[in-house]
Amino acid sequence: MSDNDDIEVESDEDSSRFPYSADKRAHHNALERKRRDHIKDSFHGLRDSVPSLQGEKASRAQILDKATEYIQYMRRKNHTHQQDIDDLKRQNALLEQQVQISNPKPPSNGAPEQKNVLQLLSPSKVRALEKAKSSSQLQSNYSSSESETEEPQSRKKLRMDAS
């Protein structure tokens, strides 16, 4: 054997693979950077969606904890509002029955029909009033959500009336 057998010579095949693997690595790094940026942007969006974290610096763990608390709070609030809606529907049905009992048939003398008080408000006005009330109470209720255990007086009255 000669001394030339121990020398490794770079072939054209080896040199052509090196740039490909560098390109592949660079492409992978770019994709990974894009993925990390997307996760970072998503956490920023989540942070900005939680009222108690808006504009604050917070770790990802804090963002997830506060977001979880806020979601639970909103679910409780949504459930309470749904109960209020159901109570109001029941009260509305009772009032409609009382109106039917007190006015069994429309006047036949050609006089205009009496309007139900509930029909006087347009649905858009009712929604606007509900939205204004809920948005003004949202921030104050969210900050004191842990102490929110007592049922509102209006619902207590409705529940007692329905019994």
Curated annotation (Swiss-Prot):
In alphabetical order, the GO MF annotations are: DNA binding; DNA-binding transcription factor activity; protein dimerization activity
Under SUPFAM superfamilies, the record lists: HLH, helix-loop-helix DNA-binding domain (SSF47459)
Keyword Repressor assigned? yes
GO CC annotation, single = nucleus
SMART domains this protein is in? HLH (SM00353)
GO:BP terms for this protein? positive regulation of transcription by RNA polymerase II
Q: What does this protein do?
A: Transcription regulator. Forms a sequence-specific DNA-binding protein complex with MYC or MAD which recognizes the core sequence 5'-CAC[GA]TG-3'. The MYC-MAX complex is a transcriptional activator, whereas the MAD-MAX complex is a repressor.
Summarize subunit and interaction data from the UniProt record for this chain: Efficient DNA binding requires dimerization with another bHLH protein. MYC/MAX heterodimers bind to target DNA with high affinity. MAX may also form homodimers which recognize the same target sequence, but which are unable to function as transcription activators. Component of some MLL1/MLL complex.
Q: What is this protein called?
A: Protein max
Gene name? max
